[in-house]
Regions:
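Membrane-anchoring hydrophobic helices of lipid-metabolizing enzymes
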Residues: 1-114, 158
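Hydrophobic (often cysteine-bearing) scaffold residues that line and stabilize catalytic clefts
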Residues: 61, 144, 148, 255
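A conditional alpha-helix N-cap/helix-loop micro-motif detector
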Residues: 93-97, 145, 164-167, 206-207, ...
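Conserved nucleotide-sugar phosphate-binding/catalytic loop shared by glycosyltransferases and other
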Residues: 65-68, 163, 170
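Non-catalytic C-terminal accessory region of glycerolipid acyltransferases
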Residues: 37, 56, 63, 105-108, ...
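Catalytic core of membrane glycerolipid acyltransferases/transacylases, capturing the structured
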Residues: 109-168, 195-197, 201
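Short, composition-biased local secondary-structure segments
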Residues: 14-18, 121-127, 175-189
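Hydrophobic alpha-helical segments typical of transmembrane helices
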Residues: 10, 22, 45-48, 126, ...
Length: 291
């Protein structure tokens, strides 16, 4: 085991020992310094929020930025929770599930099910839930840090999730799983590689967006649901939500437009919990907003 790997594991074990309500308070305190001190997370988040919410007053924008930095930090502080022994899954009422009936109905329809989510709340909570309840496959791009990759991959595999790379081999595996009437889950709000998407509006801005979902639905006839995870107030836990089925098939452009529209509606429910520190507008017809 490398020094970095040992360090990562020690941090995760330490964070796992801290009660979640205490982690929540730590997040509130530390995120204040993220807000007042210069840093790249603050810079990118602020640029994204200004682009998406140009009509916000300065005071409202600052409040949203501060909350956004808190929730971004919580994803880090929750690493012990989601990548450790996952004891939280046994706590009564810590995880609430909304509209699971919609997913159950789709699973009983003798078709594959494609779930997609934005990076909102903590998607590792979603992954752990899906792995504990269903035969689920998830495509992902491995982290560049090999030590972190080892921890993440082991945790997700232990959760019961089948992880595949986002290469041609992985896409073939996804197609097979959907045709075999299984579940595939994708965080499809990230900017895809050139050739793997189309330009589509996101909060009124033309951005390069993933076109994989409408292609998968068209090729397999699977049922598509948006799902997301949001934090409860005051460190009380999480809520996992499943929306009713939506149609992304047919014309690829229309399918991607519908996907982004669903993202917008989802994000507006808890805009402070979306990962605004990600460079969502790095491939766009607009002038770069990150300079």
């Amino acid at each position: 085991m490398s020094l970095y790997s040992a360090l990562f594991r020690s941090i995760i074990r330490t964070l796992e020992l801290i009660p979640y309500t205490v982690l929540f308070k730590i997040g509130k305190l530390v995120s204040y310094f993220l807000y007042v001190l210069p840093n790249k997370h603050k810079k990118i988040s602020n640029a994204n929020l200004k682009q998406v919410f140009p009509g916000l007053k300065e005071t409202e924008l600052k409040k949203l930025l501060k909350l956004s930095l808190f929730h971004s930090l919580m994803n880090l502080l929750e690493s012990g929770l989601v990548w450790g022994n996952k004891i939280y899954m046994k706590k009564i009422d810590f995880i609430e599930i909304e509209n699971i009936e919609a997913l159950d109905n789709s699973l009983n329809s003798n078709k594959g099910v494609l779930l997609f989510t934005p990076h909102l709340g903590n998607i590792e909570i979603l992954i752990n839930f899906l792995g504990s309840k269903f035969d689920c496959t998830i495509p992902y791009t491995p982290p560049k840090n090999k030590s972190l990759e080892s921890i993440v991959t082991k945790s997700r595999n232990n959760a019961g999730v089948n992880m595949v790379n986002t290469d041609s081999k992985g896409i073939k595996e996804i197609l097979l799983r959907l045709k075999d009437k299984k579940i595939v889950a994708i965080a499809s709000d990230q900017v895809p590689k050139t050739g793997a998407g189309v330009y589509s509006k996101f909060f009124g801005n033309e951005i390069y967006s993933m076109s994989l979902l409408p292609k998968l639905q068209k090729n397999t006839g699977c049922i598509v649901h948006l799902m997301y995870c949001k934090r409860k107030k005051n460190g009380e836990g999480f809520v996992i939500c499943f929306d009713d089925p939506i149609d992304l098939s047919g014309d690829i452009q229309k399918g991607v437009d519908n996907m982004n529209n669903e993202f917008e509606k989802c994000i507006m429910k808890v805009p402070e919990q979306y990962s605004w520190e990600y460079k969502k507008f790095k491939k766009t017809k607009l002038k770069s907003i990150y300079n």
